[in-house]
């Protein structure tokens, strides 16, 4: 399955995120739908997994929007803005990003992104 197919089918296609992307550990976008990282955001996202204190204090930027970080460690970062938010999960080679709005329960978005990340980890990605 292509990276774009993972984004289209396993993330956005579930209806539990409205936008998604998969980026490499270098910050470059591998695939995306309804989400466009601005210049430098990918690298800052990847760095956030190494330096959780910086994203906990300064928030996380995705698609030009700043999100209040509510959880950050070396595996996942959760951000909130109003009733929407973002879920970012790191695997061995990539970072999955899911964006949800007020019509989606945060837990639903988190489950979809974390589940795909677990699958990719189990398969060496």
From Swiss-Prot:
Per its record, what are the GO molecular function terms?
Answer: actin monomer binding
Family per similarity comment? Belongs to the profilin family.
Q: Which residues carry this modification: N-acetylserine?
A: 2
Where located?
Cytoplasm, Cytoskeleton
List keywords of the entry alphabetically: Acetylation, Actin-binding, Cytoplasm, Cytoskeleton
Biological role stated in the UniProt entry: Binds to actin and affects the structure of the cytoskeleton. At high concentrations, profilin prevents the polymerization of actin, whereas it enhances it at low concentrations. By binding to PIP2, it inhibits the formation of IP3 and DG.
Q: How does it assemble?
A: Occurs in many kinds of cells as a complex with monomeric actin in a 1:1 ratio.
Chief site of localization: cytoplasm
Q: Which domain of life is it from?
A: Eukaryota
This protein's name: Profilin-A
Q: What is the lineage of its organism?
A: Eukaryota, Amoebozoa, Evosea, Eumycetozoa, Myxogastria
Quote the cellular component terms of the Gene Ontology held in the record: cell cortex; cytoskeleton
Q: Name one Pfam family in it.
A: Profilin
């Amino acid at each position: 399955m292509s990276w774009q197919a993972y984004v289209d089918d396993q993330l956005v296609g579930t209806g539990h995120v409205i936008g998604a992307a998969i980026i490499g550990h270098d910050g470059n976008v591998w695939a995306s739908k309804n989400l466009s990282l601005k210049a430098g955001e990918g690298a800052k996202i990847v760095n956030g997994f190494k330096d959780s204190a910086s994203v906990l204090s300064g928030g996380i930027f995705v698609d030009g929007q700043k999100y209040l970080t509510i959880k950050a460690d070396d595996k996942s970062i959760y951000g909130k803005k109003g009733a929407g938010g973002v879920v970012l999960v790191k695997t061995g080679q990539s970072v999955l990003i899911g964006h949800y709005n007020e019509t989606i329960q945060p837990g639903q978005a988190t489950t979809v992104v974390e589940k795909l990340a677990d699958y990719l980890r189990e398969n060496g990605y």
